[in-house]
Amino acid sequence: MASHSSTLLSSPTFAPFSSHRLHYSPNPSTLRFSRPIRNKPNLALRCSVSIEKEVPETERPFTFLRDSDDVTPSSSSSSVRARFETMIRAAQDSVCDAIEAIEGGPKFKEDVWSRPGGGGGISRVLQDGNVFEKAGVNVSVVYGVMPPEAYRAAKGSASDQKPGPVPFFAAGVSSVLHPKNPFAPTLHFNYRYFETDAPKDVPGAPRQWWFGGGTDFTPAYIFEEDVKHFHSIQKQACDKFDPSFYPRFKKWCDDYFYIKHRDERRGLGGIFFDDLNDYDQEMLLSFATECANSVVPAYIPIVEKRKDMEFTEQHKAWQQLRRGRYVEFNLVYDRGTTFGLKTGGRIESILVSLPLSARWEYDHKPEEGTEEWKLLDACINPKEWI
């Protein structure tokens, strides 16, 4: 997630620059932005991103924001930064509380870290529980500096101004939940906010910002009522803001979670969006909040229904084969994961998305008409579930 040990940038699907199609060079300290600049369509920019090393903490702070962002326990700032941090930490709490309630005993292990110049994060992982094989829910707040080339790439146009290094802020919550029972689906969600400050030597330069995120699920077996329930909750959240959001973001999700070398999707989708700044900022903050608040009602009832179903070794083997696909996507295609691996990110946070166990069999093909085949067919040919 960050170029130097950032939980935020290495979370699944979470790289603040992901919307600008980062490509990676052999040198782990450099990145290439391939978003074309006006009048120079073939220009590939190379730049490094500077972020401080994290420091372990023994307690959760009230906020990870810098003092200059004007946040105190008695007077909460109205800034988008402050409210987004409040939202992602509340989302982390609500999801972890719901998971622990289902587990009936096992608790999340929590790691807290900060950086001397501001920012930090909370990583929570539950492993080998009663219901979940592995569950991770991470939040991060990151301050860093990008070079002027990155700033111009973010603006999407060339400029006569020659700004110096550009400060940026990024915050997000990211989670992957892998249940034990093969009839209970895996869930992934991620919501993030990115903002630049004006370069110090160009104080009038415009501030850039965008939102990204999504919620998607990956079952090993299709229960149509579960799929319809999950997608209906996503649609309800989207429809509160714009009726075009659900069909647009549902297709975006199907396209993003595509395993090219398999010619299939990772799962049965959900919603996904990135680089979203073409609406009112307050509206998008409310939208991201609504989506994050929809995670528990969309997912937990499905797990409650499926967690105690009887299953065979064949069912478990198929679940592990599908988790093999999950591993392939995350390590080969996921922008946040690959960014963290190539730039020295916090490895435990990067790999928290991977299942505890997975399986690969040579030339495995489910028999046509079986429940396993139906799942594979739906991953190859995305459907409209509602």
UniProtKB/Swiss-Prot annotation:
<feature type="transit peptide" description="Chloroplast">
    <location>
        <begin position="1"/>
        <end position="48"/>
    </location>
</feature>
<keyword id="KW-0809">Transit peptide</keyword>
<keyword id="KW-0627">Porphyrin biosynthesis</keyword>
<feature type="region of interest" description="Important for dimerization">
    <location>
        <begin position="326"/>
        <end position="361"/>
    </location>
</feature>
<dbReference type="GO" id="GO:0009507">
    <property type="term" value="C:chloroplast"/>
</dbReference>
<dbReference type="InterPro" id="IPR001260">
    <property type="entry name" value="Coprogen_oxidase_aer"/>
</dbReference>
<protein>
    <recommendedName>
        <fullName>Coproporphyrinogen-III oxidase 1, chloroplastic</fullName>
        <ecNumber>1.3.3.3</ecNumber>
    </recommendedName>
</protein>
<keyword id="KW-0560">Oxidoreductase</keyword>
<comment type="similarity">
    <text>Belongs to the aerobic coproporphyrinogen-III oxidase family.</text>
</comment>
<dbReference type="GO" id="GO:0006782">
    <property type="term" value="P:protoporphyrinogen IX biosynthetic process"/>
</dbReference>
<dbReference type="InterPro" id="IPR036406">
    <property type="entry name" value="Coprogen_oxidase_aer_sf"/>
</dbReference>
<keyword id="KW-0150">Chloroplast</keyword>
<keyword id="KW-0350">Heme biosynthesis</keyword>
<keyword id="KW-0934">Plastid</keyword>
<keyword id="KW-0149">Chlorophyll biosynthesis</keyword>
<feature type="region of interest" description="Important for dimerization">
    <location>
        <begin position="125"/>
        <end position="134"/>
    </location>
</feature>
<feature type="site" description="Important for dimerization">
    <location>
        <position position="261"/>
    </location>
</feature>
<dbReference type="GO" id="GO:0048046">
    <property type="term" value="C:apoplast"/>
</dbReference>
<comment type="pathway">
    <text>Porphyrin-containing compound metabolism; protoporphyrin-IX biosynthesis; protoporphyrinogen-IX from coproporphyrinogen-III (O2 route): step 1/1.</text>
</comment>
<feature type="binding site">
    <location>
        <position position="174"/>
    </location>
    <ligand>
        <name>substrate</name>
    </ligand>
</feature>
<feature type="binding site">
    <location>
        <begin position="190"/>
        <end position="192"/>
    </location>
    <ligand>
        <name>substrate</name>
    </ligand>
</feature>
<dbReference type="GO" id="GO:0015995">
    <property type="term" value="P:chlorophyll biosynthetic process"/>
</dbReference>
<comment type="function">
    <text>Key enzyme in heme biosynthesis. Catalyzes the oxidative decarboxylation of propionic acid side chains of rings A and B of coproporphyrinogen III.</text>
</comment>
<dbReference type="GO" id="GO:0004109">
    <property type="term" value="F:coproporphyrinogen oxidase activity"/>
</dbReference>
<feature type="binding site">
    <location>
        <begin position="344"/>
        <end position="349"/>
    </location>
    <ligand>
        <name>substrate</name>
    </ligand>
</feature>
<dbReference type="InterPro" id="IPR018375">
    <property type="entry name" value="Coprogen_oxidase_CS"/>
</dbReference>
<comment type="pathway">
    <text>Porphyrin-containing compound metabolism; chlorophyll biosynthesis.</text>
</comment>
<feature type="active site" description="Proton donor">
    <location>
        <position position="188"/>
    </location>
</feature>
<dbReference type="GO" id="GO:0005576">
    <property type="term" value="C:extracellular region"/>
</dbReference>
<comment type="subunit">
    <text>Homodimer.</text>
</comment>
<dbReference type="GO" id="GO:0009570">
    <property type="term" value="C:chloroplast stroma"/>
</dbReference>
<dbReference type="GO" id="GO:0042803">
    <property type="term" value="F:protein homodimerization activity"/>
</dbReference>
<dbReference type="Pfam" id="PF01218">
    <property type="entry name" value="Coprogen_oxidas"/>
</dbReference>
